[in-house]
Design a protein with these regions (language model features):
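Conserved catalytic cysteine-centered active-site region
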Residues: 54-106
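Gly/Pro-rich active-site capping loops and adjacent beta-alpha segments
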Residues: 103, 107, 112-117
Length: 139
């Protein structure tokens, strides 16, 4: 198998749950980054054959296609969203390598979407009825 060239790579910022990025949707973080990577590589957005995006906390929709459009890819770009709780970004890169190796694409954007900042706060629901234990109040 031939080596798969990586023209550029970058990382979006991360923050804790409910932190500074809680109001940002994943494609809003990634689109400027992808546009910059394409510009640095000297490629127009129309050169992208596919976008493969790993997503750990999907809330519906199609984040890979939304990212492709937000980064400037015209038309209806081929896009694949992989929904996985662990290693979603790595799975996306592996899938992109397959597209390249099989000759199905020449230029692929691949990676993971940061969405943990937007994770909902989930509380454990008791399995039986009864009074809930109270935490001590402030001093």
């Amino acid at each position: 198998m031939n080596a798969m060239p990586i023209l550029a790579w970058a990382r979006t910022p991360v923050a804790p749950v409910g932190g500074a990025l809680a109001a940002c949707r994943p494609h809003e973080l990634a689109a400027p980054l992808v546009a910059r990577l394409l510009a640095d590589a000297g490629l127009p957005a129309s050169a992208v054959d596919a976008v493969v995006l790993g997503n750990a906390l999907g809330a519906g929709g199609h984040p890979a296609r939304v990212l492709a459009r937000a980064a400037g890819r015209p038309g209806r770009p081929p896009a694949i969203t992989l929904d996985s709780q662990c290693c979603a970004g790595l799975d996306a890169i592996t899938h992109a390598c397959g597209l390249l190796a099989l000759g199905q694409a020449q230029v692929v954007i691949a990676g993971g979407a940061e969405a943990w900042s937007r994770a909902p706060l989930r509380l454990h629901r008791p399995t039986q009825a009864g009074p809930a234990p109270l935490a001590p109040g402030p001093p």
